[in-house]
Regions:
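Short, well-ordered coil/turn segments that N-cap beta-strands
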Residues: 11-16, 45-47, 71-75, 113-117, ...
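Glycine/proline-rich, positively charged
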Residues: 27, 39, 43, 87-184, ...
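Terminal-tail/helix-coil boundary detector
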Residues: 198, 224-247, 251, 266, ...
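Conserved, mostly hydrophobic/aromatic
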Residues: 6, 18, 34, 49, ...
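A short acidic, helix-capping loop that chelates divalent metal ions and anchors anionic groups
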Residues: 21-25, 84-91, 282-285
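Active-site beta-loop-alpha junctions enriched in small/polar residues
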Residues: 21, 52-54, 80-84, 121-124, ...
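Aromatic-lined glycan-binding groove of carbohydrate-active enzymes
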Residues: 188-223, 255
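N-terminal binding-site loop/beta-alpha segment at the start of enzyme catalytic domains
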Residues: 1-75, 210, 344-354
Length: 354
């Protein structure tokens, strides 16, 4: 496994992260399974562990605390706060400072550590001002309890607002974002990935296999934990895309999951899939994606099968008439070789003129 530099930091992170939602009591894994999965991930070179104070009502963190007791510093340990963990307590949810402080202390205790390598804000709480979130996170960084901060499930414009505010006020900006992104849901390409490029934010991807659909198991009639509906998508939606993934996998002699993960790794910028597993065989297949590089023809086939419209204002701004009015009649003779402009991202990174 290779490593990526985490955004505008010097931290080195593996090209796959291990998701540990299944380590919680909700999943009822055999007692020795989490240890085996963690060892397998580490032996493959993985060093990023993704968990949350909400997974299994804290039991996923407790399990990790036990497993990492003698090897804590070998991993980049990340966890999250925001989601409700104490029903009945009106302040036991949200992005606000009180929930951050209480949740972080509980996570440190369960994980048996004195610091979190990266603390994610799990989802946007629109009641809490962005300034409160960023200042509260900065306080935890300055206290040494958190090394880096990340943001998950926020609108792209608010992530941009948050990092701009942090930079202007000398606070700690988000070092990474975590988003939902896969071959069945490419909506992130319109706003999130261009924004991430502008801010040097790596994208950690949850749901990279679309709740197992991109493994092809539902086409084979197998059952799964999200058998009927998952995150608003009916079971049969996207079957044509899954069939294309399966076709390419058969041509390559690889599992479909590896094709789906390799496609994510081929995306521009730093895209790091968060892989989870309930069995060692599942994890073995997912880890095997790191040595698969899809060729241009297969990438083109997948793009054709899954592309989403760019939408407004992107298509509008690229109409030839608008281009001439915005840039003048000499626009085709102007060379822009800068690498960090919004133009280079929004227009060129993902889209071709239609």
């Amino acid at each position: 496994m290779r490593y990526r530099v985490l955004g505008r930091t010097g931290l080195r992170v593996s090209e796959l992260a291990l998701g540990t939602m299944t380590f919680g009591d909700d999943w009822d894994l055999p007692e020795d399974r989490p240890a085996k999965l963690l060892e397998q991930f580490a032996e493959a070179g993985g060093n990023v562990i993704d968990t949350s104070n909400e997974y299994g009502r804290g039991t996923a963190e407790s399990t990790l605390g036990e497993l990492l007791r003698d090897q804590r510093d070998a991993f980049v340990l990340t966890t999250k706060y925001t989601l409700q963990v104490r029903p009945g307590d009106v302040n036991a949810a949200g992005n606000h400072r009180k929930n951050l402080v209480v949740s972080l202390e509980d996570s440190l205790r369960r994980l048996r550590t004195d610091h979190i390598d990266m603390l994610w804000v799990h989802a946007r709480d629109t009641l809490t001002p962005v300034a409160e979130v960023m200042r509260a996170l900065d306080d935890q960084v300055r206290a040494g309890k958190v090394l880096y901060t990340g943001v998950s499930n926020w609108p792209a414009w608010e992530i941009a607002q948050a990092n701009t505010l942090a930079e202007e006020r000398g606070w700690t900006p988000f070092a990474a974002m975590q988003i939902h992104y896969n071959l069945l849901d490419r909506a992130a390409e319109n706003e999130f990935l261009p924004m991430a490029h502008a801010f040097d934010l790596p994208a950690f991807v949850w749901g990279p296999l679309a709740d197992g659909r991109l493994t092809g198991k539902y086409l084979r009639g197998e059952q799964g934990r999200l058998d009927k509906v998952a995150w608003g998508r009916a079971r049969g939606d996207g079957d044509d895309v899954v069939r294309e993934v399966v076709r390419i996998a058969e041509e390559l002699g690889r599992p479909p999951a590896q094709v789906a993960l390799a496609w994510l790794r081929s995306r521009p910028g730093t895209v790091i899939p968060v892989i989870g597993a309930t069995t060692e065989e599942q994890l073995r297949q997912n880890l095997g994606s790191v040595d698969l590089e899809l060729g241009r023809a297969h990438l083109a086939d997948l793009d054709k099968a899954t592309a989403v419209p760019a939408g407004y204002p992107h298509l509008f701004l690229r109409f030839p008439a608008m281009t001439r009015m915005i840039y003048g009649e000499h626009w085709q003779r102007v060379d822009d070789r800068r690498t960090t402009t919004r133009r280079a991202v929004t227009d060129d990174l993902f889209r071709t003129a239609e």
